Swiss-Prot record:
Binds 2 manganese ions per subunit. Presumably involved in the processing and regular turnover of intracellular proteins. Catalyzes the removal of unsubstituted N-terminal amino acids from various peptides. Its EC number is 3.4.11.1, 3.4.11.10. This is Probable cytosol aminopeptidase. The keyword Phosphoprotein does not apply. One of its GO terms (biological process) is proteolysis. Its cofactor is Mn(2+).
Amino acid sequence: MVLFHSQASCCKRVKADAIVLPFWQVQDKVRCAASIVEEYEPLYQVALENFAGKTGEAELIYSYGQGKEKRILLLGLGKNEELSSQDVLEAYAKATRILRKAKCTTVNIVLPVISELRISAEDFLSNLTSGILSLNYNYPKYTKECQSSEPLLTKVTVLGIVPKIADRIFRKEESIFEGVYLTRDLVNGNADEVTPQKLANIAKGLAKEFPSVDAKILNKDAILKEKMGLLAAVAKGSAVDPCFIVLSYQGKPKSKDHTVLIGKGVTFDSGGLDLKPGKAMLTMKEDMAGAATALGILSGVAALELPVNVTAIIPATENAIDGASYKMGDVYIGMSGLSVEIGSTDAEGRLILADAITYALKYCKPTRIIDFATLTGAMVVSLGESVAGFFSNNDVLAQDLSEASAETGEALWRLPLVEKYDKALQSDIADMKNIGSNRAGAITAALFLRRFLEDQPVAWAHLDIAGTAYREKDEDPYPKYASGFGVRCLIYYIEKFLSK
């Protein structure tokens, strides 16, 4: 994907469908933040009568043939002294939404005067690029026409920046968003198409694309041989075989530092015998968003050739129903040897993650484990669609993730591992139950996973992305449906804190 181009001079720009001009809000007035594109000044001066320049405010007007573009988009950036990176991202995401609705495919963007910016030019450009890329995406529709009524942007030329500086940022963000789009495509895809085997094939494809990536796929027989009794139990009711995916990237082979990403890969969740209501099942193709996130992150890390070692582990299965489905009240033994009494077959995600954690500890020698899962409805109730809750046994890891969250705008909120709630997982007939009481569900789910670390000195974080992975409405800077949430944040974390 090469969408972005750059040019130092506005005067020599090529023709385009639209030009985007930035504006500052200065007390009660509005001022163009860029070096004036003179031919358009009379036109936009008229439009400024009803334009305040607030952050994200936008107005699209016609140029009436007076320049090289057919339309002019006035884009408010608010007050310069208050400008944040997230403001930039959201403003240009909104601009993208407006331009696509107007069927503009080629766009010239004039940067503000660099010396006036409160944030660095690199930061501004990076977030501008991310904002545009985030909404330059189409949900894979299954209509007869198979075409979106809003065409994608095909060429974006950023004016007022030295190409040598800009192009490096563009290529980096484009590589990251290849991972975001991969995540979105997998989450948005039909559950009958995005099966465990499909996820395995995606992993194999990444191994072919990147020389430093290797894929290992365990089939049903290999899963049983490894005594992954929890993953095997969840898979019992499905006509589709499970698989266990191990995708390894070696960017620094001599280093012992090793990050393991674990993604919940339930490709469709009926709830099992503890059947979900029909309405709750409508979006359950998204229950493999953790797996898709792990694949998207590893894709981005490999594309950027970061000097780190990262392994993505994906336990993949459906949670379906037939006469062989695993049953409530029964006890199953995981790869760790720990036994679990099934209090609900709809608490299946933590079961397959438990076997994945055990596998990582046995074979991968991880420095840290970070898991991603659409795990609990309790998290959606607590934090909604805009914030993902996370838990960690390590303050340094938690702080670094929080900083990455703040820098990328993908909001994470650390929640406590309340020790006394662990008692809710006690069982009279097994080492533990897979559900606690009807309270603090997100916390008890995290405490369940922590048990499988078995006191090993491994930093661990659990991200419950149940609310953020799939959105019911458009809200800048995310499209409706799959968001790709977490990919940018974790790539930033890996690059900043681990690429040393």
